[in-house]
């Protein structure tokens, strides 16, 4: 894939829609506009068809404005990406609930307007979160270059973040820590392979080089945390013991060796060309996160965290949804044929990025960074762990802080009870009531989910910490 610097963009006004039952409020650059009744909602939407339109929450709420039979939803991997209105050029994107922590629709609109103005300075037009993330990166490039490697091999070594938990247990004196700006920091830290070439299986697996290898690995059964992911089904990851086979990055296989695993490489690929295309981008992102308002800065953070996944996108599992009723209760999906995306041969970039974060989680979060003894985590989630407070002593002073790439202390927990990855509750030294945490939910929603699942669910089990402490 040839990556080119961003060219000229077409700019349109941005508008935030707040849909209700047969009502619509639109926050526009020229003021707030309102409509009541299905016909009036349609007319208002049509008048805004030359705007970039967004909702803060779910796109499906738009069905309530005019009736669902007038809308069409674009789907990708089971998620609605955009919705369009019949007889108009209206196309609506979602802000993916990024601003849910901020009160008031007007405040959310002003935050997005601030983001749009900041992007304008870089020549980036508003669009979907993914499109803005991609074009912001391209705006920081000063020359064209190539990213291209065998898509099958790249995808075989592409795994997601590590998520594990010990459900149904209560622990005392624990601490939640995470790596600040883990993904963008690792993207900018060292070079990637522009493309790779096959080399001898006996080639040393240098952890700082962005290589890939197919290997057979023996993970000792007494190792507390398996270092390498394998696939269980299409989406789930497993952390298995004994003999496993697969493709991983050099960095991840080197980490496995350091923990005592036996690695037998059958095929190996090393960088033929190297590129470091994210340094300027990371400078721009950090500037935006530091200078914009908290709400707008959170949107910039979302853009920066979305970029790496673009390199692993595929054009399969696509479709459109129509509704045959006015209430949105009778959806019909039409599957669309798979198409080849330009990013289909850049999966090695996504694979290397996620691997870098997993290796740090493994060698610093799950195991002690000083001597590789177990840190005994009870909760692992992508770029953060919850570990005994005592384990923090193995981190040196330079590793802990609020700078990008450092381990940040989020919460000191007097008591914690875990149900699943991204689902737990805790008390601090200064609180007497439980604080509930669940990904993408309010505290009240998290509490309800927590109480509905007393034994936990769908988890990858960690060793029982009460038996290892």
Please state what every model-predicted region is:
Residues 1-12, 18-469:
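Conserved acidic
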């Amino acid at each position: 894939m040839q990556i080119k610097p961003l060219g000229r963009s077409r700019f349109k006004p941005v508008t935030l829609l707040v849909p209700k039952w047969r009502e619509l409020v639109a926050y526009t650059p020229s003021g707030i506009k309102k409509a009541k009744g299905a016909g009036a909602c349609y007319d208002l939407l049509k008048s805004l068809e030359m705007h970039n339109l967004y909702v803060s929450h779910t796109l499906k709420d738009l069905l309530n404005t005019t009736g669902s039979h007038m809308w069409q939803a674009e789907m990708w991997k089971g998620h609605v990406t955009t919705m369009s209105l019949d007889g108009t050029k209206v196309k609506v994107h979602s802000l993916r609930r990024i601003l849910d922590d901020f009160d008031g629709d007007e405040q959310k609109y002003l935050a997005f307007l601030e983001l749009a103005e900041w992007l304008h300075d870089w020549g980036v037009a508003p669009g979907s979160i993914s499109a803005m993330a991609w074009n912001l990166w391209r705006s920081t490039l000063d020359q064209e270059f190539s990213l291209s490697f065998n898509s099958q091999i790249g995808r075989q070594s592409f795994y997601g973040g590590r998520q594990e938990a010990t459900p149904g247990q209560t622990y005392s004196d624990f601490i939640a820590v995470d790596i600040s700006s883990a993904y963008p920091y690792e993207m900018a830290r060292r070079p990637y392979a522009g493309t790779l070439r096959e080399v001898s299986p006996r080639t040393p697996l240098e952890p700082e080089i962005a290589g890939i290898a197919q290997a057979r690995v023996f993970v000792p059964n007494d190792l507390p945390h398996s270092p390498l992911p394998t696939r269980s089904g299409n989406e789930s990851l497993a952390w298995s013991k004994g003999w496993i086979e697969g493709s991983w990055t050099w960095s991840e296989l080197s980490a496995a060796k350091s923990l005592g695993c036996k690695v037998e490489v059958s095929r190996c690929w090393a960088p033929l060309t190297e590129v470091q295309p994210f340094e300027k981008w990371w400078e721009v992102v950090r500037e935006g996160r530091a200078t914009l308002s908290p709400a707008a800065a959170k949107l910039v953070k979302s853009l920066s965290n979305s970029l790496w996944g673009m390199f692993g996108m595929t054009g399969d599992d696509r479709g459109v949804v129509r509704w045959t009723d006015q209430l949105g209760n009778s959806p019909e999906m039409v599957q669309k044929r798979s198409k080849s995306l330009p990013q289909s041969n850049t999966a090695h970039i996504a694979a290397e990025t996620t691997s870098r974060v997993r290796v740090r989680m493994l060698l610093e979060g799950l195991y002690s960074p000083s001597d590789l003894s177990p840190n005994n985590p009870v909760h692992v989630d992508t770029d953060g762990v919850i570990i005994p407070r005592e384990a923090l002593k193995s981190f040196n002073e330079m590793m802990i802080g609020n700078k990008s790439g450092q381990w940040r202390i989020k919460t000191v927990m007097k008591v914690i009870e875990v149900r699943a990855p991204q689902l737990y509750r805790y008390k601090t030294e200064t609180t007497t009531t439980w604080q509930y945490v669940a990904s993408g939910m309010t505290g009240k929603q998290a509490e309800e989910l927590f109480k509905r699942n007393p034994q936990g669910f769908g988890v990858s089990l960690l060793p029982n910490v009460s038996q290892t402490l």
